[in-house]
Regions:
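An alpha-helical appendage that flanks or caps ligand/catalytic pockets
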Residues: 103-145, 190-323
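Short, acidic/polar
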Residues: 9-20, 74, 159-167, 313-323
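Hydrophobic faces of well-ordered beta-strands that scaffold small-molecule active sites
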Residues: 3-7, 28-30, 55-59, 86-90, ...
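Glycine-rich, proline-tolerant flexible connector loops at the mouths of alpha/beta enzymes
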Residues: 27-50, 62-63, 94-97, 179-182, ...
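N-terminal beta1-alpha1-beta2 module of alpha/beta enzyme domains
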Residues: 1-59, 153
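Alpha-helix-loop-beta-strand connector modules within alpha/beta enzyme cores
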Residues: 41-58, 113, 120, 198, ...
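Conserved, mostly hydrophobic/aromatic
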Residues: 24, 47, 78, 117, ...
Length: 356
């Protein structure tokens, strides 16, 4: 099992990835959300310059904010700086679009995007859809050092439901998941396989398809409660980001929240609905995956914390990682609270990476 880090892209926080490389983390995924963080490609360029071994890429770039040729050129530029260790993660825009009051791309649009993107990443000609036209495009100076399209850039497609997971299996070299339950991983593998079979791909070999799950980890001290102040300080932001996502699903589609949120749901929705409707999309993601805003701290119940993060003793987490490996997961990437990120980085490296 590989352990990677997902990073809220911060142009002045490159040392965090440098330290992750020193500690043996396998991948650094730079998050892409233009109304929250620094630009992911600018951050990746600095990361590429300061590191030499860790795999680096977008975690994940957003199809609905940058046209496929722009994203392809961006990651191919990073590949020129870090050949052989650059990857490209892409999704339809859960937070990056919703924070602007827009929905993620629809599945049909996302598939069309991937159809353009895949050949571009390989240095080939692609078809760009514009209005009702299909236009052939390609990078016309790929051999002059501007980009690197010679060294492969693995494509990892983010998927949550059956259709997006099917697209990941069909077009991707791997998938980015938001689940860390072994049974759910097995179910996701089935959906990935369905997509792969539609184009006669074989996902059975790990070398053919690489799966990653986003979460964070807290290694408990002896006798420590799952909702201790330290636990909240290390994974509370991840927990609330999951609540933000559930609220968006409820708000946009009428989906009911998971059972873990039942104890807070009424109070949480009342809080958000006290904000003006025309700017509520700005408030939903306050502190997103970095901090917990003060008025949301009361929602960090044991159930909410445990639903989105891997919290347990060293042995419990190692056993869970073993179960996830058996279910077909290749990597867990962690995204801890911003203020405690170095503490988590060191603890997970010492207690987990050294033992898996």
């Amino acid at each position: 099992m590989d352990i990677g880090v997902c990073v809220a892209s911060h142009i002045n926080d490159i040392d965090y990835v440098v330290r992750a490389e020193e500690l043996g983390y396998s991948h650094a995924w730079m998050a892409d959300s233009q109304m929250l963080w620094s630009d992911c490609y600018a951050t990746l360029a600095l990361v590429a310059d300061k590191t030499s071994r860790i795999n680096i890429g977008t975690g994940v770039a957003v199809s609905g904010t940058r046209p496929a040729p722009v994203n392809a050129a961006g990651i191919a530029t990073i590949n020129a700086l870090a050949p052989g260790r650059t990857f490209f993660g892409v999704g339809s825009g859960n937070t990056a679009r919703r924070v602007m009051g827009l929905p993620p791309q629809r599945i049909a649009e996302f598939e069309q995007y991937l159809q353009t993107l895949v050949p571009l990443l390989a240095g080939n000609e692609a078809e760009l859809r514009y209005d009702d036209k299909s236009i052939p495009i390609k990078h016309i100076m790929p051999d002059k050092g501007f980009v690197n399209l010679s060294d492969p850039i693995p494509l990892y497609v983010s998927g949550f439901g059956p259709k997006s997971l099917g697209l990941a299996g069909k077009y991707g070299d791997g998938a980015v998941l938001g689940i860390t339950d072994p049974q759910a991983i097995s179910g996701a593998r089935h959906m990935l396989n369905e997509g792969a079979r539609s184009v006669e791909k074989d996902l059975e070999s790990p070398s053919n398809f690489y799966t990653t799950a986003l979460t964070t980890m807290v290694v408990l001290d002896d006798g420590e409660a799952i909702d201790s102040d330290r636990v909240k300080a290390e994974c509370g932001a991840m927990a609330m980001a999951a609540v933000h996502y559930s609220y968006d699903q409820f708000r946009n589609f009428g989906h009911q929240p998971p059972n873990a949120l039942s104890g807070i749901w009424e109070d949480y929705t009342n809080l958000l609905e006290s904000y003006p409707a025309d700017r509520r999309h700005q408030r939903i993601h306050a502190g997103h995956n970095c901090w917990v805003v003060e008025e949301e701290e009361k929602f960090l119940t044991p159930e909410v914390l445990n639903a989105s993060s891997m919290i347990g003793t060293r042995d419990q987490i190692i056993e869970r990682l073993s179960d996830l490996t058996d279910a077909g997961l290749d990597q867990v990437m962690i995204l801890p609270n911003f203020d405690t990120r170095f503490d988590v980085l060191e603890r997970v490296a010492a207690d987990i990476i050294q033992n898996v």
